[in-house]
């Protein structure tokens, strides 16, 4: 594959993204080349983009040449996660996606990552967790339908609840307690998956679903409530590392950059059924 800047016209990626350059080159028989180059890049909306995983996705998408609109109400997200981004193709909107979502211009893809995700957060914000999983997903899907955009839902391994099968394959329906304290997160994501598939089947929206397992890495809060940051926090304080139960339990852990690479590949794939990652 020819690298950017080494191709037929010797222009870099920013030049090719510029419509004026594309128009000028159309007079020199380069329109097909330029159209193919420009069409590779998308305008992508990420809800929950200031969160742990969402912010890493912003970085990944920008590195691939796409324009990114980051939307977050900052209930659990933090602008510190995106303050390092100094790219003219990046914009941030503070907004609650349980309300009607308006986005000017074309949107090629929507990645719906808005939701409290750690046990501490969804136990403190149970109603908000249910609302963003239901209303927020509905609003984001409505925008995808309006814009003709591809939609990727960030789901979770928690849709399996307390599984009776190990490891879980995507066709396993799970073992979930809908009225337990974790139920607000589990059921919000199960509903989100159901309405995503309904939009796919009824409205023909091009959808993807990723079921994310335990993820760790930079920008994760030490007081997140999950195992890895808890262990690290205890070690930094010189405390004993707490293991609940008899220690025989298993978890699937994934470094955030590996997860984000998998999410990006799923976004670019033709797979419309849920995919486990982590």
Language model regions located:
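Glycine-rich Rossmann NAD(P)(H)-binding loop
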Residues: 47, 215-219, 243-253, 268-271, ...
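Intrinsic-disorder-associated, low-complexity terminal segments enriched in Asp/Asn/His/Tyr and depleted
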Residues: 12-18, 39
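N-terminal Rossmann-like NAD(P)+-binding domain of SDR-like oxidoreductases, especially those catalyzing
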Residues: 36-215, 235, 245, 257-267
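Short, solvent-exposed loop/turn segments at secondary-structure boundaries
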Residues: 124-125, 219-223
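Alpha-helical substrate-binding/gating segment
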Residues: 229-241, 253-276
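Aromatic (phenylalanine/tyrosine) cluster motif
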Residues: 9-11, 25-28, 33, 41
């Amino acid at each position: 594959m020819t690298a950017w800047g080494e191709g037929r016209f010797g222009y870099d990626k920013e030049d090719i993204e510029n419509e004026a350059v594309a128009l000028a080159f159309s007079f020199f028989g380069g329109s097909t080349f330029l159209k193919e180059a420009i069409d590779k890049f998308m305008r992508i909306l990420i809800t929950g983009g200031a969160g742990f995983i969402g912010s890493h996705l912003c970085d990944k998408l920008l590195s691939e040449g796409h324009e990114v609109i980051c939307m977050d109400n900052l209930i659990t997200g933090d602008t510190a996660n995106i303050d390092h981004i100094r790219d003219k193709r990046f914009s941030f909107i503070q907004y609650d996606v349980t309300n009607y979502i308006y986005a000017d211009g074309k949107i090629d893809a929507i990645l719906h990552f808005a939701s409290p995700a750690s046990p501490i957060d969804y136990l403190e914000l149970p109603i908000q967790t249910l609302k963003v999983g239901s209303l927020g997903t509905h609003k984001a899907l409505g925008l995808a339908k309006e814009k003709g955009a591809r939609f990727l839902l960030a789901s979770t391994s928690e849709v399996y609840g307390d599984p009776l099968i190990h490891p879980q394959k995507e066709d396993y329906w799970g073992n979930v307690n809908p009225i337990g304290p974790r139920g607000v997160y589990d059921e919000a994501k199960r509903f989100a998956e159901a309405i995503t598939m309904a939009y796919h089947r009824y409205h023909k929206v091009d959808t993807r679903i990723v079921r994310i397992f335990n993820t760790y890495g930079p920008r994760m809060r030490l007081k997140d409530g999950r195992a890895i940051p808890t262990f690290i926090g205890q070690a930094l304080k010189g405390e004993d590392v707490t293991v609940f139960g008899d220690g025989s339990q298993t978890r699937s852990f994934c470094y955030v950059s590996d997860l984000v690479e998998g999410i990006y590949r799923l976004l670019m794939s033709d797979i419309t059924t849920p995919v486990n990652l982590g």
